[in-house]
A protein has these predicted regions:
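Non-catalytic interaction/regulatory modules that flank or connect domains
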Residues: 129-211, 215-218, 224, 229
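His/Asp/Glu-enriched, well-ordered alpha-helical/loop segment
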Residues: 3-84, 90, 202-209, 220-225, ...
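Short, glycine-/Ser/Thr-/acidic-enriched flexible segments
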Residues: 19-21, 81-83, 94-96, 102-103, ...
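Hard-cation-handling environments
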Residues: 56-57, 61-166
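Conserved short beta-strand edge segments in small beta-sheet-based binding/regulatory domains
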Residues: 229-235
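Conserved small/polar residues in nucleotide/adenosyl-binding loops
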Residues: 260-264
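Short amphipathic beta-strand/extended segments with alternating polar/hydrophobic composition
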Residues: 98-101, 179-185, 239-245
Length: 264
């Protein structure tokens, strides 16, 4: 909020990254950031300008980001600056959302070639426990709950669930190089099975954490079978999974369906 005073606000934009489906549905997107900024003392007009006009100007969308002659009629109507609840959404001057009810609109046309490519991004041979087995001592990554930073937790040459030392691996999945980086993780708290995901910035290879090499292999293989996603594997089967078949990082389901799947 201090950056959004008169001196720096012209050079600021709002953005989100990796918003969970429930966050989007329950809290919102850029509108939620605007609401938070206003709550932290930013002038409402400044917050809206940063969200709309600054972003449009940066991306050279010169006919968007403001309500003025020559601009597209893309705008929202809110109840108040204090609450900032969006009541109506207009796109090119046409009412598209009215108090939460979305008007039907045609899906965008996507080249079939691009669709096929986006659903065929995993090039990984079948993985086995041996692929995750390495007797050499490896560094232990110490997780810090709620923080992006980690700590050096020493070394290990084996999994030790009692002391929360788990196997962690990164499996290259784009070019079938069979490159697998292996290490250990402490602080995750997993007691059985494994968790694997293809959402792993920025290369989005497969990351798997497990209590055994067999579970690591099984969870990673299941991610490949799904063409991407998040898998919780335990006792020889997937106990929870969220398919992300578009490039391994996005769902082709509706927001409501994805919310139900991820909550389950």
């Amino acid at each position: 909020a201090p950056l959004l005073g008169d001196k720096y606000s012209e050079r600021c934009m709002f953005c989100t990254d990796d918003k969970h489906p429930n966050d989007l549905l329950e809290k919102g997107h850029i509108d939620y950031i605007v609401k938070r900024a206003i709550g932290l003392g930013v002038e409402p007009i400044t917050a809206v300008k940063v969200a709309c006009h600054n972003a449009a100007r940066y991306f050279l969308l010169n006919n968007r980001g403001a309500i003025a002659p020559g601009y597209l009629g893309d705008f929202v109507i809110i109840d108040s600056f204090q609450d900032f609840n969006i009541e109506r959404v207009f796109k090119k001057g046409e009412l598209m959302v009215d108090h939460g009810v979305v008007k039907d609109f045609p899906a965008p046309a996507i080249d079939p070639y691009l669709t096929e490519r986006a659903h065929s991004t995993f090039h990984v041979e079948h993985l086995t426990a041996e692929d995750f087995t390495d007797a050499r001592p490896r560094g232990i990554i110490g997780m810090v709950n709620g923080e992006i930073t980690t700590v050096d937790a020493g070394y290990s040459d084996r999994i030790d669930v009692e002391y929360d030392v788990l196997k962690i691996a990164v499996v290259e999945r784009h070019k079938n190089t069979h490159h697998i980086g292996i290490g250990f993780l402490q602080g995750y708290g997993l007691k059985s099975g494994a968790v694997a995901t293809s959402v792993s910035h920025d290369s989005h290879n497969i990351i798997v954490v497990g209590t055994s090499e067999d579970d690591c292999a099984a969870a990673a293989n299941r991610v490949v079978e799904l063409n991407g996603g998040i898998v919780v594997w335990d006792q020889g089967k997937p106990v929870a999974e969220v398919p992300l078949a578009i490039a391994g990082i996005m769902s082709d389901e509706s927001l409501t369906c994805l919310l139900y799947t991820s909550d389950a």
